[in-house]
From Swiss-Prot:
Residues 1-4, 60-72, 143-150, 204-247 are periplasmic. The keyword Heme does not apply. Keywords: Cell inner membrane, Cell membrane, Ion transport, Iron, Iron transport, Membrane, Transmembrane, Transmembrane helix, Transport. This is Ferrous iron permease EfeU. One of its GO terms (molecular function) is ferrous iron transmembrane transporter activity. InterPro entries: EfeU/FTR1-like (IPR005217), FTR1/Fip1/EfeU (IPR004923). NCBIfam families: EfeU, EfeU/Ftr1 family ferrous iron transporter subunit. Residues 26-38, 94-121, 172-182, 269-285 are cytoplasmic. Part of a ferrous iron transporter composed of EfeU, EfeO and EfeB. The chain crosses the membrane at residues 5-25, 39-59, 73-93, 122-142, 151-171, 183-203, 248-268. It comes from the Bacteria.
Length: 285
């Protein structure tokens, strides 16, 4: 159950971001009497989704044939990539959430005013916008699946994606009003704790791969207080990568990541032209 929730939340959030992008594009095309271009939008969405799925399956199937130490190394690398992507996702959304709509509409206008290849330009714009959300999800899910071999994580991911699509459709048709600013703020805070757990897990994987053997003394042992076999321990392990007897290096990495991330997260956001440039680059690279 607990191993299901984190993949569910990540896929729901990422899927909702992608759904909102498609919804904004569809609404703008409809509002500007250019609904005939919706076919190009769906081509971009489908191609991006298929590519992300293929990349995820390929990486997951390929690594299963690695020797044990190479698998641990790859698991650590994937965890590091997932931490970087999740962190970028949190702070990018915090920085440009208020200006995405304006720059997305500008990117659509640029694509459709690009001459004879305007249809392909729109396909490319949608493809890159959706593919980036998809690749963020792929690397996080690879890290999650490697930490939990059960069926809970895939089920959570699928349910999260389905819910995101349904909510995105409801928002587009006007049936649901979601306070997106609060939603992304609190899910972002949760994701930072998840990323800290992944960072600690990466160090553990690198140790098992034989690459990191420093500070391997047990920092503390809570086996008798909060075992991972207890209900709360299982919850914390599934959510945040909790370990009942972590090493000094795991605890250090956890807080070295989490403390600066939380400080930056709670600092007042700066409203600058840089935010607009960042948004434009993400939507229309």
């Amino acid at each position: 159950m607990f191993s299901t929730f984190v993949p569910f939340l990540i896929m729901f959030r990422e899927g909702l971001e992608a759904a909102l992008i498609v919804s904004l594009i569809a609404s703008y095309l409809k509002r500007t009497q250019r609904g005939q271009w919706m076919g190009a939008v769906w081509v971009g969405v489908v191609v991006a989704a298929v590519l992300c799925l293929a990349i995820g399956i390929f990486i997951n199937e390929t690594t299963g044939e690695f020797p044990q130490k190479q698998q641990e190394l790859f698991e650590g690398i994937i965890a590091v990539v997932a931490v970087c992507i999740l962190t970028y996702m949190v702070f990018w959304m915090r920085k440009v959430s208020k200006s995405v709509k304006v720059h997305l509409e500008g990117a659509i206008d640029n694509a459709l005013n690009s001459g004879r290849g305007q249809g392909w330009a729109l396909v490319a714009m949608v493809f890159f916008a959706v593919a980036r959300e998809g690749l963020e999800s792929v690397f996080f899910l690879l890290a999650a699946f490697q930490q939990d071999v059960g069926i809970g994580a895939p089920i959570g991911a699928i349910l999260g994606l389905v819910c995101a699509i349904l909510v995105g459709m409801a928002i587009y048709w006007g049936g649901v009003k979601l306070h997106l600013a609060k939603f992304f703020k609190w899910t972002s805070l949760f994701i930072l704790f998840v990323a800290a757990g992944l960072a600690a897990g990466a160090i553990r994987a690198f140790h098992e791969a034989g690459l990191w053997n420093h500070f391997q003394d047990i920092a503390f042992d809570l086996t008798d207080v909060l075992s991972t076999h207890s209900l709360l321990g299982t919850f914390l392990e599934g959510m945040f990568g909790y370990q009942e007897a972590p090493t000094v290096s795991e605890v250090s990495v956890y807080f070295i990541y989490l403390i600066p991330a939380l400080i930056l997260f709670f600092l007042p956001p700066r409203s600058t032209a840089g935010s607009a440039i960042a948004a434009a680059r993400k939507i229309n690279p």
